[in-house]
A protein has these predicted regions:
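Basic, alpha-helical interaction scaffolds
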Residues: 1-38, 473-546, 598-601
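Surface-exposed loop/turn segments and immediately adjacent short secondary-structure elements
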Residues: 1-27, 32-33, 104-249, 254, ...
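Short amphipathic alpha-helical coiled-coil/interface segments
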Residues: 30-33, 56-64, 72-87, 91, ...
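Catalytic palm subdomain of template-directed nucleic-acid polymerases
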Residues: 67-68, 203, 322-339, 414-443, ...
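Conserved pre-catalytic core of RNA-dependent polymerases
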Residues: 152, 156, 168-389
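Short, conserved micro-motifs composed of acidic
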Residues: 169, 448-480, 581-588
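Catalytic palm active-site di-aspartate
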Residues: 193, 232-235, 251, 283-285, ...
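Active-site palm subdomain of RNA-directed nucleic acid polymerases
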Residues: 270-283, 386-417, 421
């Protein structure tokens, strides 16, 4: 392939040598890559029932010819027996493959086999038809495509000015090393865009091809002009719920050319760090070393700090309506100019956003291409950074409003991308913050979904507390619990309800995988490893923010024994003790100790980070502790498990190697 590519490139290179047009360079590059790969083996699609045989299909045809029950039933029974036999044989072969890949450390192939057996690749069923604006059902394919084109056009329609020109022409040429790094970071096995070029093809280019790709990228970077094909995206619709018929009940994923993705990875490397420095510490989304864990942890710790000194925490959980699709492109470019992004980078982003088009694909048929006039691009590596800086300028206008004061620092919001929690210490301050955030968000085109935006009071006596926050003429609903970043927050800031919820989610997943996890074909050791990967990981989501008691620790161990008894096919009615179960399976309880170690390691991470999380853990709030026995706090767990006073925990956690030893050793039980 490499030789074929080089030969064709050398033949056509002379024709385009003097050309400075990105379009011609792109057509040459695309033709060369596709020609070199035209005889490459194609990936075969898998059938729905891979165990189905020609013999069974033939028997089914014979069954159709049966004219009465006496003729039909024997044939039907024979087919059922054949299906069971073939399915069992296929199942056993897959189990053997799992064992083989496990022994060879082929984890990717092992997980692929597990998904085949458990049916995790199944998509939600759809009717194939959708409703128009008036709610009338559309059945014809042309009508469905036309409706999708209309929906996309209306969703992304905006009145924007002509293409802006950057205030400077700064920006160094793109280096070959940058392109090589971007290609190396690109994942394999991803669907191509309209050009048909896959990541596997681009990874085969090697030095000669990468030189040509770098030339193309520098032409685009210097002029800001993109080849037309690179600006075309294809949207694939996925239903949010089974049998969805309304366009708004679908989510779309975007297929774009991988060549463009690599180019944008280069741009990301240039502007990503600059944007991240400008984003405030209360934004946890799309940032290195940060995620939902940090957002959940920070909110829970702040809530506990308020309860320690008998103060209430007033919260408004904001839900924006399609926030990523409502970004105004003109304001986005202005944000980039304000933080000093190079002119060439701004020009590239502006041209990309002003000239992009998209079409919807329904069963291999495309709707007409539509201009996308607002919103950040779906599936683009730049979008998270651009959205973060866009919303940062909204909240900069609100930072001076009073929220909570912890360790001398005013905090009135916690964010993960568009998931926002506004926090204050009283109703009046919360009303001011909500009003200001709504006002600034509206200026930027983002609208609150009033029906889904909720308020809550974290308090020692929540039943006596009421809060009325207005958005326009509507009063926001006050709730007793709220799912924030996938974890359930309650008005008493306890972990018991969240742990019960995680247990139920994990049990539901276990029941879906029960056929595999209770199979006698797999070794117990393999099943335990699968349980740890698929079941325990679901259960432990957000466990770093849990505050545990002796009762909750007992519930965690009971859930672990439930899983172990199931995979060992041991019933409760067998009256076998937990210790005997562990001996029979030749294993030990590990779930609780793993959670404890994760919490301790996370405390060390927080202590050494010296950021808002450190402030939340170590900071003090004004106020006095109430009378009576104090509640267990997050730090209570750390002190009791390590048998160290708070001051020793603080000093020793600052030493990574020392704290690592403490987190690994057997921990003190309550």
């Amino acid at each position: 392939m490499k030789n074929k590519y080089e030969l064709l490139s050398l033949e056509t290179d002379e024709q385009c040598q003097e050309s400075s047009e990105p379009e011609k360079k792109w057509q040459q590059l695309k033709e060369s890559i596709n020609y070199a790969n035209e005889n490459a083996p194609k990936i075969e699609r898998k059938t729905k029932k891979v165990w189905m045989t020609e013999e069974i299909l033939t028997k089914m045809e014979e069954r159709k010819k049966a004219k009465n029950t006496s003729a039909y039933e024997p044939k039907n029974k024979e087919i059922q027996n054949l299906c069971k036999k073939e399915k069992d044989a296929w199942y056993n072969n897959k189990c053997d493959e799992i064992e083989k890949y496990l022994n060879l450390n082929g984890t990717k192939k092992m997980h692929s086999c597990i998904k085949e057996l458990t049916g995790d690749n199944k998509s939600k069923p759809t009717t194939g038809c959708i409703k128009d604006k008036e709610g009338k059902m559309l059945f014809e394919r042309d009508q469905v495509l036309e409706r999708w084109a209309e929906y996309v056009s209306e969703l992304f329609a905006d009145e924007r000015p002509s293409l802006p020109e950057p205030s400077n022409d700064r920006g160094p040429p793109i280096l070959k090393s940058e392109v090589e790094k971007a290609i190396k970071m690109t994942q394999l096995g991803k669907a191509p865009g309209e050009d048909g070029i896959t990541t596997e093809m681009l990874k085969l280019l090697e030095d000669f091809g990468i030189d040509k790709l770098t030339e193309l990228f520098n032409l685009i970077y210097a002029s800001g002009q993109f080849p037309e094909e690179l600006l075309m995206s294809i949207y694939i619709t996925l239903p949010k719920q089974p049998r969805a018929t309304d366009c708004s009940n679908f989510r779309t994923i975007s297929l774009m050319p991988h060549t463009l993705k690599i180019f944008l990875k280069v741009i990301q490397g240039r502007i990503g760090t600059k944007i991240d420095k400008e984003v405030g510490p209360t934004q946890f989304g799309f940032r290195p070393g940060s995620g939902t864990r940090e957002g959940i942890f920070c909110y829970n710790i702040i809530a506990q700090k308020h309860l320690e000194v008998d103060k209430d925490l007033y919260t408004c959980f904001i839900d924006y309506s399609k926030a990523f699709d409502k970004v105004h492109h003109e304001q986005l470019i202005q944000c980039l100019e304000k933080i000093g992004v190079d002119g060439r980078d701004i020009r590239v982003i502006a041209n990309l956003y002003w000239h992009q088009k998209a079409a919807i694909r329904i069963q291999n048929q495309l709707s007409p291409f539509t201009s996308i006039q607002r919103g950040v691009r779906q599936g683009c590596v730049l979008s998270p950074y651009l959205f973060n800086i866009y919303t940062e300028f909204i909240f900069r206008e609100c930072n001076e409003l009073q929220g909570i004061n912890i360790h001398g620092q005013n905090i009135n919001n916690l964010r993960y991308a568009d998931d926002t929690a506004l926090i204050t210490d009283n109703q009046e301050n919360l009303q001011r913050v909500v009003t200001k955030v709504r006002e600034e968000s509206s200026k930027a085109g983002l609208e609150m979904n009033v029906k889904k935006t909720k308020t809550m009071i974290i308090s020692r006596k929540p039943e006596d507390k009421k809060v009325e926050i207005k958005v326009g003429d509507e009063i926001l609903q006050q709730v007793h619990k709220y799912i924030y970043l996938g974890t359930e927050i309650t008005e008493e800031a306890r972990s018991d309800i969240e742990i019960e919820k995680r247990k139920n989610i994990a049990k539901e997943k276990f029941s879906k995988m029960a056929g595999l996890l209770t199979s006698r074909k797999l070794k117990i050791k393999t099943k335990i490893r699968i349980v740890k990967c698929y079941i325990y990981s679901l259960f432990c989501y957000g466990c770093e923010s849990w505050t545990l008691s002796k009762v909750l620790e007992g519930k965690i161990e009971a859930f672990e024994m439930f899983c172990l008894r199931k995979i060992g096919n041991i019933k409760w009615s067998d009256k076998i003790t937990n210790e005997r179960v562990l001996q029979k399976l030749q294993t030990k309880r590990t779930l609780l100790s793993d959670i404890q170690k994760r919490k301790l390691r996370y405390y060390g991470h927080v202590k050494r980070s010296n950021n808002i999380l450190t402030t939340a853990v170590e900071g003090k709030l004004e106020g006095k502790r109430p009378r009576g026995r104090p509640r267990n706090t997050w730090m209570t767990d750390v002190r009791e498990w390590t048998s160290l006073p708070a001051s020793a925990c603080t000093s020793q956690a600052a030493d990574r190697s020392l704290w690592s030893v403490i987190a690994r050793r057997p921990l003190q039980r309550r």
